[in-house]
Amino acid sequence: NILVILADDLGYSDLGCYGSEIHTPNLDKLAKQGVRFNHFYNTSRSCPTRASLLTGLYQHQAGIGRMTFDDHLPGYRGTLSRNAVTIAEVLKESGYATSMVGKWHIAETPLRKDQREWLAHHVYHETYSDLCHYPVNRGFDNHYGTIYGVVDYFDPFSLVEGEVPVKEVPDGYYITQALSDRAVKEVKEYAKDDKPFFMYLAYTAPHWPLHALPEDIEKYKDTYKVGWEAIRNARYERQKQLGIFPNMDNFLSDRQFKD
């Protein structure tokens, strides 16, 4: 079985296992029991990374060199190319059950003037991109999640079940928790069968608009109150104590920018 979990715009230093002030015990446990990278490259932005991850190709080869709108240039068409085979398509042909839960954002979804007004999904319900580019038509047996890249966490725009728009969400809905619950439910169902499964779990968090639950806001509201310079100095001192940097004052060059 294969489970791929993707966070959205998560910083390298935002995880506890890499020294963050934010508590991430479950991810830290995964890191401790698995492999942590200390040197790697990626494609920098959200949707190009998704295109590369799902196809094994450079983002331009996959058709998404920048974002999900058509720049009318090869490699910049804003939609996952039909010449780029997804891992879901390959595994499905190999006998795997395939599921996607979460954010797609590799089909052309043009910017609109009223974009900020329709972050909440209830503004309209229609096809958010050509259906042939939806996850269920690119190798996934099913998909619960969003097509667009930016959504309201409490009332997400472009939320779909397969090809069908989800017209309303219950009171208290929070997409991060909803995606987790859906993934857990599906994994439990897969466990009843001997057929191998591939799940791609792609969260919308922590991408803007940075919507958090009240209890999480309360927990961290003072964590960075002292400002980024104080946090930077504290991290640097900790790195010296751990022997990552030599314990000397002039090891780093002068900063380019000052407060």
Tell where the protein language model's regions lie, with residue ranges.
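Formylglycine-dependent sulfatase
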Residues: 1-259
